[in-house]
Amino acid sequence: MAQAKEIVPAPVVVEEAPVQVVEKEVIVYRDREPQGFRPNGYVDLQYRYYGEAEELNYKNNGVSNNYGRTQLMGRINMTENQALEYRIRSYNDWNSSSNDKQKGEDGTQTRLRYFYNHGNVGDSSVNLTSRIEYRKEAESDAQSLEYQARFNFADYLFNNDFVKTTEFTIAPKYKYYWASNSDDYQNRLGVDLFTMHQFPFGFSFEFNLYGDQYFYGQRQYTNDHSTVKNNTGLTMEAYLYNTTNLYTNDKFDIDFYFEGGYDPYNWNSEKVLKTAINEKGDLNDPTNYTYNDNTYEWYAYPQIITTYKVSPNFNVYASLGAEYRNWANINQKSAKDWRWQPTAVIGFKTTF
């Protein structure tokens, strides 16, 4: 009897695959260090033309008043705490300056302001900023230098959907004023109030008070034969602003802009505010003036402003408008002769 053979399976050899070690790049994310302060600011250059105010010409007022004004203004934030503002206005007479019948505005006005932000006072939310201002007037070449300690209490006032206070500053000050005559100088001590409030629908309201105690180096006339050495003055400014967009796209904006109000109202303890009776007469003759203790100017200035965005940091603009103001008589008791004066503006603004 045949026996079955036992079949023994052959051994299976299993080859182990080689182990590969793959090193992956490990990216370590670190917080980016904040960049240091970079100086920034803006530059605005414009030309403004003032047309003849209605009826205020040589025939009716003895002098034409159409002129142009080139204005260069801007701000440089030099450090986190320091800033410089500048405004230079150069007036050019559109008439013949040698002809008294066609005399307009002329000269250059310069204003420079340096700010130093000291931060909040103690643990309060009151900001303290020092401001030094230098100013040179266009007509008389009079100059002034002023220091203010500006305490801003805006964080303690309104901040809701209806009204937001962006500035409420109380500023003690000292000012030194001097003219070409060595005796014609003034020392002024006082306190100013600056406020700004924003409202819905593009409205805002600015209200300012300037309180001054004047100490004159040269006695000031209060009529044709009386003079004073000291005076107390209070000046009020009140402006209403509104900006309403009429059309906009990626490049163009057309806005209706309005501003108006008291610009300014002046009160004095002495009648040192004088107005020439005859602008072509002797301006050094005290009998050629009327003297008042209160004056005011009120105005309204609607405009249409068109802005073209050349780039994110460069805009050009133009506006047409007219200013309504009591040009001829600003005496509080007899203010009158409100007249329209057309204006046109073209300019550009760049930020950096």
What spans do the regions from the language model cover?
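Cleavable N-terminal export/targeting peptides
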Residues: 1-42, 79, 311-313, 332, ...
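Surface-exposed strand-loop-strand hairpins of Gram-negative outer-membrane beta-barrel proteins
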Residues: 46-70, 92-103, 285-292
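Outer-membrane beta-barrel channel domains
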Residues: 63-158
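Residues that define the transmembrane beta-barrel architecture of outer-membrane proteins
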Residues: 64-70, 104-110, 141-149, 183-191, ...
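Predominantly the C-terminal beta-signal and adjacent terminal strand-loop region
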Residues: 212-231, 238, 261-352
